[in-house]
């Protein structure tokens, strides 16, 4: 059951990401990064329970199921790392280690579900905008 919930979340996340054109090279890295940040925030704010299970219960999976979920997470993280590497290559981002930057950004973005409450002081769009500004400043050259 736990594996099925996690697999469903990751499959849904990856399926929703692809049509957004985030990983494609047609846009500048800064535009792709903004799309990624906003997508991640909105997707996760709509599913806080699934996010909690998917990120906090990984340790409770057996080795085979852990490897499957870890592979799906890696595929998702690779989209962000590709953007960060492209931005570093064109001089718009300063990320000395793209993998560490990827993990740091993902952790920051995913953490929003621990405190955000619908109907609170900020809308989901407000939060996405604030997080985008923080991420942009963190990686800008």
Indicate residue ranges for each PLM-predicted region.
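Amphipathic alpha-helical packing segments from all-alpha helical-bundle domains
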Residues: 8-18, 64-89, 99-103
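Hydrophobic alpha-helical connector segments
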Residues: 18-49, 102-105
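Short helix-capping/turn signature of helix-turn-helix
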Residues: 55-61
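C-terminal alpha-helix
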Residues: 83, 134-141
